[in-house]
Amino acid sequence: MPNDSFAIRLREARRMRKLSMDKLVELADFVVTKQSLSRYERGVMRPHANVLSTLAKALDVSEDYFLGTNMHIDMPMLRTTSGGKLHEDDLMAIEARLSYWTERLLAKERAASFSVEFKNPIENFQVSSLEDVIRAADLLRQLWHCGDGPIASVLRLFERKGIRIMEDELPADVYGLSTWADNRLPLMVLDTRHSKTTADRLRFTAAHELAHLLLSFPSSSDLTVEKRCHKFAGFFLFPKSTFIEEMGGEHRDELTLEEMVDLKELYGVSIAAQVHEAWDLHMISREHYDWWYDENIKKNQMEEGWGVYAFPETVGREKRVDARIRNKVK
């Protein structure tokens, strides 16, 4: 671990608990001063063993968390799924928060007898081409018993299948990240703030990160990994055969805003993603695709006034775990 990793982990654990330094000093039974705590978080000083133990108890986490040995978070994958948009310090802070949150969630799941093991039903599925992407999306829907219609909540679906999803405030250009803990536990980090994203964007981001977690990406492809993940997200949310049926055929002279708004409100798929899918399937001409992007989508990237997916796209697993623990205590 880097030399300042303890400082980052202490700071992020305190922030995750929404504690001021004064409050943490109080919870630690005043065995540490606010001045010392500040020095720990700045990396100027390290606590003695007895103080470390007390801080761990106050923050409800193992001492191994501070050493970075409580679990192995796949940092290279976290770095990859950030798209190179994050500074290393930001990545370390996110990794610390993710490690802290995951350790506490797993402990609560054990206490509530509410744990689920994740199984990748399309493990080692090689995705090189658009055809591979479509097959992978269709197969996953089949194996997860999703049918060929709208998926009401992809976040709740992913949680049910064993993917742990942490909500976090991410930097401006980053909407989601994904990685593995101990090579067996899939993790997603999503920025769910309404000020930053919309329900359809959030669904697309989550499906994109799902592709990173489940699929294998051979280097011998004309498509970048990011493009393959984008296309998987689109076809997972709106399957090829269903899209063609909804559009009334395999070829269209033009797409209308009104029909795509209707489909957006039903399937939770943005206008932009629908136009992309129509082009991927050669349903529309390049000229019509360019017209939609240049004259419409680029001028309204948040798609304001173009319909809203009404179903609440939220996470809920941790809330239910907490409820079961509270019920046990009664």
Where are these regions (language model features)?
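Active-site hotspot residues in diverse enzymes, especially metal/ion-binding acidic/histidine motifs
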Residues: 1-330
